[in-house]
Curated annotation (Swiss-Prot):
Induction: Repressed by YetL. Induced by several flavonoids.
Protein name: Putative FAD-dependent monooxygenase YetM
Gene: yetM
Alphabetical keyword list: FAD, Flavoprotein, Monooxygenase, Oxidoreductase, Signal
Single annotated GO MF: monooxygenase activity
Gene3D superfamilies: FAD/NAD(P)-binding domain
Cofactor: FAD
Signal sequence extent: 1-32
Binding sites annotated in the UniProt record for FAD: G12, E31, A32, V126, D285
Taxonomy, superkingdom: Bacteria
InterPro entries to which the protein is assigned, alphabetical: FAD-bd (IPR002938), FAD-dep_Monooxygenase_BioMet (IPR050493), FAD/NAD-bd_sf (IPR036188)
Amino acid sequence: MKHMLIAGGGIGGLSAAISLRKAGFSVTLCEAASENRKTGAGILQPQNALAVLKELGVFEDCCKHGFQTEWFKTFDEQGNLLFQVSESFLDDSLPGRNNILRKTLNDILMKHAEAVGVDIKWGKKVVAYEETAESVTALCEDGEKMQADILAGFDGIHSVVRDKMLQKETEKEHLGMGAWRFYIELPDYTFEDATFMYRSGDTQIGVVPLAQHAGYVFVLQPCTSDYWDEEDTRFDRVKEILSGFRGLDFVTKHMSKQHPVIFNKLEQVAVQEPWHKGRVIIGGDAAHAGAPTLAQGAAMAIEDAIVLAEELQNHADHETALQAYYKRRAPRALKVQNLSSEIVRRRLKGEPGAEELIGECYAVLREGY
């Protein structure tokens, strides 16, 4: 095996490209978008994510362009502190958490991928593939064909590679909540060393520092599977939700329509079948997209990427390598996914025990991957 083809240029796909290239493989990455992402909210990088970022070689860049916090503080709607927990659960030598804009993280990964020699193809959406005993050929939307030894689908929750491999359309499970997210600029020195969460009933609002004067806000509220919030109503809807939280006055008065509000429904995909067939493998959200409750989506995708490269390097036979990858990754990723969705379910129904599940997840994450 010499040449690897990756579908998807998000966090998982770029991480896989870097890992495989460092392992000595020739790598081509196909991304459907015509250029690297220019928008997006923030992303939280807990300690296990920082550990894999270090292994990937991008830890220093992420910390340089991110904002580190040590505490997670939870408040009621009046702004009264309910409790705080340390974000350090794995390694005292690492920051508790690094928060970074998704666009910035993509830029960092793109820079490192290009530096190690990944061939990046923009505007190339993989829509099908054909296999022989010797190779796999991906068909792009524009008609171009690309041949490789392995095709890795890191093409997200709506993965074409996954659905072609499984020969069915994978159903997305609605988790009962919608999420609104937006970037915000605030006065200097607003933030120090903590991420904030505000709760009232079934509404949760997170305020995540990206700098001492800037951050991103996410709002979680119940919604039906057929609900959608149009772009032109999102700003006013979010402002109305925040107005019920006196403790969030410092956010509400600085909201600006210059920064668009992103909306999506919380959905998950849990692939119960093997993640590989023949010369095709999936990873990241294509295999285990889940709730953002524990901020583990990106971390799990990067772990997938590193393990895939290790197993392909360790085994000359592709079937043995892909099976070893699946056996290492599926139990851990699906366990974290299940815990994340169960936390959403309990909070949605007002049931106790969500905090205990967070501790259970941390215990899983302390184990090697």
